[in-house]
Amino acid sequence: MTRKIAIYGKGGIGKSTTTQNTAAALAFFHEKNVFIHGCDPKADSTRLILGGLPQQTVMDTLRIEGAERVTVDKVVKTGFKDIRCVESGGPEPGVGCAGRGVITAIDLMEENEAYSEDLDFLFFDVLGDVVCGGFAMPIRDGKAEEVYIVASGEMMAIYAANNICKGLAKYARQSGVRLGGIICNSRNVDGEKEFLEEFTKAIGTKMIHFVPRDNIVQKAEFNKQTVTEFQPEANQAQEYRELGRKIIENEDFVIPKPLAMDELEAMVVKYGLMD
């Protein structure tokens, strides 16, 4: 049975990097069949898996050829360890709604049976901290069953995580989606781990893994690879291996209890993140 997971988090927090490195570790170390569906108009959710190759998006194919000619072969590409990849794409800049593109792309993938039954994991890598409209579709309509939020010990990352939890709590009862935990993509700020542990406990979940900051991630990206492909014996590859293991074994799924703004600000002040 395929586990369907949406990855959310503040813009620039490293969602796509975390998603791709986790997917690579699941495929390489744990021998899982993985599919990544990029839900960002930038269409950069799968480039490390595909060795930096540009991918024609679902929306581009729709514009060029029409819905009736969109096929799995045209828009789904296979990369490292047979990880399958598709990018929703979006409208031309300044025209239309990118969220609508996410809805259209997911619907088309389902109609074309792209999410095959042999998959162990299907990841939706979702734009920024937007939890309304089309970008909420994976959690609103039950396309994803689990959510992991990528955060750090920085103030705005925590604010974004709390806002995502508000959206998740709103849709959870109607769609059945649940929060599986917070992934800390470390920025090496003071008290980061302690802050994340207190925040996750307060909202009723856990920090599923603390991913330390390591320059090998950037080195691998320069080589258009995930860390696991670039240097599988590296410490950072083992961190993603461990994150993958924790996701595989995770059975702790909750409806989060987001903090009120005064509670959140008090926590931020406690850890010295606000002047």
UniProtKB/Swiss-Prot annotation:
Reactions the enzyme catalyzes: N2 + 8 reduced [2Fe-2S]-[ferredoxin] + 16 ATP + 16 H2O = H2 + 8 oxidized [2Fe-2S]-[ferredoxin] + 2 NH4(+) + 16 ADP + 16 phosphate + 6 H(+)
Binding positions for [4Fe-4S] cluster per the UniProt entry: C97, C132
Recorded superkingdom: Bacteria
Annotated GO biological process: nitrogen fixation
InterPro entries: NifH/chlL_CS, NifH/frxC, Nitrogenase_Fe_NifH, P-loop_NTPase
This protein's record includes keyword Lipid biosynthesis: no
PTM info: The reversible ADP-ribosylation of Arg-100 inactivates the nitrogenase reductase and regulates nitrogenase activity.
Residues annotated to bind ATP: G9, K10, G11, G12, I13, G14, K15, S16
Required cofactor(s): [4Fe-4S] cluster
Gene Ontology molecular function: 4 iron, 4 sulfur cluster binding; ATP binding; metal ion binding; nitrogenase activity
Modified residues (ADP-ribosylarginine): R100
Key words, A-Z: 4Fe-4S, ADP-ribosylation, ATP-binding, Iron, Iron-sulfur, Metal-binding, Nitrogen fixation, Nucleotide-binding, Oxidoreductase
Record text on cofactor binding: Binds 1 [4Fe-4S] cluster per dimer.
Statement: the UniProt record of this protein carries the keyword Nucleus: no
EC assignment: 1.18.6.1
Function as written in the Swiss-Prot or TrEMBL entry: The key enzymatic reactions in nitrogen fixation are catalyzed by the nitrogenase complex, which has 2 components: the iron protein (component 2) and a component 1 which is either a molybdenum-iron protein, a vanadium-iron, or an iron-iron protein.
Family indicated by similarity: Belongs to the NifH/BchL/ChlL family.
Other notes: This subunit is associated with the iron-iron nitrogenase component 2 (the third type of nitrogenase).
Assembly behavior: Homodimer.
Protein name from the UniProt record: Nitrogenase iron protein 2
Organism the protein comes from: Rhodobacter capsulatus
